[in-house]
Amino acid sequence: MELIIISGRSGSGKSVALRALEDVGYYCVDNLPLPLIPELAGFLSNSGRSAVVSLDIRNIPENPESIEALLEQLSKLTIQTKIIFLDCERNTLIRRYSDTRRLHPLSNKDLSLESAIDLENTLLEPLYQQANYIIDTTNISSHELAENLRGILRGSTDKALKIVFESFGFKYGLPADADYVFDVRFLPNPHWNPELRPMTGLEQPVIDFLERQTEVHNFIYQTRNYLEMWLPMLEKNNRSYLTIAIGCTGGKHRSVFIAEQLAKYFQSRDKDVQIRHRSLEKHHKKIS
């Protein structure tokens, strides 16, 4: 369990950082008032949870001693605390504010953008000096920032990409959440066997029928090879889920069997796998 404090200049990417850490399992709180942070840390210590708190110029007092007192108070707790500071070059911050046309948080002090950035830099100096990690976001994308954060905290939590295999029937429409869709309607169809028609791809007679088909074996082999080739790149792309949809006409036989086979294969490779049969779920709801 640990408390991660994200701070840094306005416009340096703190919102991106919070979303990235939320995706890897942290409980995230944006702009928690400074006096409440020790209370949150105490709660986390008792509950065994980890959390991320963002501190920016809106909830940081102008007195540097307040920040030092907070850090000293946190050091007395059993929970581990880390500070990640996001920095960025002044000219890049000016350009980002110009592009988004947003107001700097200190603009309400009747300061120009440049003066607001400089004042903020002074006020954040105590956190900058105490930071465990400093990330310069001047020349990196939001995906690269997220990957840097994941790399820093990998020893604490490394949430694997969850691969969802789902079968569906084309006659019910394409699943909206699919990243990849594979059409297996060209494969031999158990539907035309009167004995197999009322069954599903989860039942042994249908499994036996499909396992005898060379085309089915070839499709499974080539599909899993394709996925294995690109999975490393997908895992590095800051994803939480990868949804792979397998579709046949009714979503009852071929797609169910193939989704099951692919799921079992990737489970055997220690991947985090979930399986879902959309059309079977619809059919079950109609019956019940």
UniProtKB/Swiss-Prot annotation:
Keywords: ATP-binding, GTP-binding, Nucleotide-binding. Signal peptide: none annotated. One of its GO terms (molecular function) is GTP binding. Gene3D superfamilies: P-loop containing nucleotide triphosphate hydrolases. It holds the Pfam family RapZ-like_N. ATP binds at G8, R9, S10, G11, S12, G13, K14, S15. The keyword Lyase does not apply. GTP binds at D56, I57, R58, N59. The keyword Nucleotide-binding applies. Belongs to the RapZ-like family. Displays ATPase and GTPase activities. This is Nucleotide-binding protein APP7_0339. It comes from Actinobacillus pleuropneumoniae serotype 7 (strain AP76).
